């Protein structure tokens, strides 16, 4: 047997092994997705995430399928002693998957890991001043989204958000909005849209609303949109996503064009889920 024969033999065996692993994973995935949504998870969502009960039946069923896919394809990691229980996994998955309901979605294809801390965590940042001097700063964080497939969350902040789904603040919605924004690269406040024309309309509406928020805050005024949204366009998108899902009636009334743009992107009307 020549070296060429050996090369092709090894290559063939490697391809057979790869195909076997792929077929096994596909079969295992299909089997997992065919399982009924566990009653324990359903009860968990009813008691821990009140908005779940108010979803229409079709959206509730779709959310369950997204949750199962999410939990099968993403890995949770506990940090600083945080236990990764079914409650932690299911609640985070449910809130994250609210953002991908009722529309064609990649299901966070770039996301691999969710790191969960018990409470606020410290993020270290290197910054360079005008003279080129590099220093390190430390910031207490509730959550963070990275473009390399990672989301970091503080569990106590997640809990506050899931029980109070009407204050316009939700760390899971915020960080996973960043994930959607990062699907086309760095977070810039413009996620992947459906048509080429959509980008022009999006840019017009968001630029105007972002500028108005900054101007209002500079004058010392109050805004329905949290002041953190004035940081940059990426944070603006994440902040108004929280508002869209949690305070849709107020947003529709005070920021109708912004609400319309977000409704066109998320293809939902969360006002239908609000308490009567």
Predicted regions located by residue number:
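Short, charged/polar micro-motifs that form catalytic or ligand-binding hotspots
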Residues: 49, 53, 78, 82, ...
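Metalloprotease/metallohydrolase-associated module, dominated by Zn2+-dependent proteases
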Residues: 91-108, 113, 117-166, 186-276
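N-terminal low-structure segments adjacent to metalloprotease catalytic domains
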Residues: 1-119, 185-201, 205, 248, ...
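Active-site recognition of the HExxH zinc-binding catalytic motif
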Residues: 56, 167-183, 238
